[in-house]
Amino acid sequence: MALPETLHDFLLVFLGSGLILGSLGVVLLTNPIFSAFSLGLVLVCISLFYILSNSHFVAASQLLIYVGAINILIIFAVMFMNSSEYYQDFNLWTVGDGITLIVCTSIFVSLVTTIPDTSWYGIIWTTRPNQIIEQDLISTSQQIGIHLSTDFFLPFELISIILLVALIGTIVVARQ
């Protein structure tokens, strides 16, 4: 989008704060329904970030796939859960929570120490005039399809297998 710089900066700060508040809502809210709605807010904010970056196809895909399908599936699964069983076995602190805290803290500390030491100016950013002219003949969705079937084939297939395992796990949990 060709927005004025002040409006673009304001939207970045607004979407960033919405993203942070939504993520905190996903993690900190005890009601799973509210947590799922907060996840929807996070996914919509990410989609709006893509729109600000002029990636309209990715933004539409984000809205359709994640917000329109996966988040709704999560909300339906949470609504089918028996809430009395969910709150009955609630422990304040478990061993898994301690391990998760240690892992997340170590990742956070490593990121905090690595990011300031990175030479961001050494990264080559591609700009529009420097790109190959033949790429203009192929539409954006065709470029995405070409990259998914060549360069990103293995990660794309791994993500599809992970989603398949998650759906099978959801079906198994729903049957019990």
Curated annotation (Swiss-Prot):
Main location group: plastid
UniProtKB keywords: Chloroplast, Membrane, NAD, NADP, Plastid, Plastoquinone, Quinone, Thylakoid, Translocase, Transmembrane, Transmembrane helix, Transport
Subcellular location: Plastid, Chloroplast thylakoid membrane
Annotated signal peptide: none
Family under the similarity heading: Belongs to the complex I subunit 6 family.
EC number: 7.1.1.-
Organism, scientific name: Cicer arietinum (Chickpea)
Recorded topology in the membrane: Multi-pass membrane protein
Gene this chain is encoded by: ndhG
Gene3D superfamilies: NADH-ubiquinone/plastoquinone oxidoreductase chain 6, subunit NuoJ
First-tier enzyme category under EC: translocase
Domain of life: Eukaryota
Transmembrane residue ranges: 10-30, 32-52, 63-83, 92-112, 152-172
An annotated GO cellular component: chloroplast thylakoid membrane
Record Pfam families: Oxidored_q3 (PF00499)
Recorded GO MF terms: NADH dehydrogenase (ubiquinone) activity; quinone binding
Function (record text): NDH shuttles electrons from NAD(P)H:plastoquinone, via FMN and iron-sulfur (Fe-S) centers, to quinones in the photosynthetic chain and possibly in a chloroplast respiratory chain. The immediate electron acceptor for the enzyme in this species is believed to be plastoquinone. Couples the redox reaction to proton translocation, and thus conserves the redox energy in a proton gradient.
UniProt KW Protease keyword: no
Complexes and interactors: NDH is composed of at least 16 different subunits, 5 of which are encoded in the nucleus.
Catalytic activity: a plastoquinone + NADH + (n+1) H(+)(in) = a plastoquinol + NAD(+) + n H(+)(out); a plastoquinone + NADPH + (n+1) H(+)(in) = a plastoquinol + NADP(+) + n H(+)(out)
Protein name: NAD(P)H-quinone oxidoreductase subunit 6, chloroplastic
Presence of keyword NAD: yes
